[in-house]
């Protein structure tokens, strides 16, 4: 599979339907909808836009605690980023999904992942005046994402 045609949504869908990666019924259902929507032309998939977001996160976003390594997205994260930034409304060309509700199990890096998506939207996505919200059951939890976002790109001088 060449790099241009690589689609993480399809790859993740194949992995969860084959049983190679375990996923719940709702995850399987949403990826089935995404794959069918892309295949039947309900939406346009722009691989270049999806890859741009993934590359930004992996090349400019650093861990905000502990080590200072760049983030390395897992397949499920690449599939989510691809869905957010690569699936477009066929009539308008705008992102199909403008609001995203992520439910991720404990200790899977959801705060850092959300902060990386926020950084891409703030610095690169090109939407003037974009509003980014962090919601959580407690203010302290939402503040973690805000603090992570603030520290995420600090080691990257090329953004300054």
PLM features per residue range, with description:
Residues 1-152:
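Phosphate/NTP-binding elements of NTP-utilizing enzymes
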Residues 151-160:
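Single conserved hydrophobic/aromatic residue that forms the stacking wall/gate
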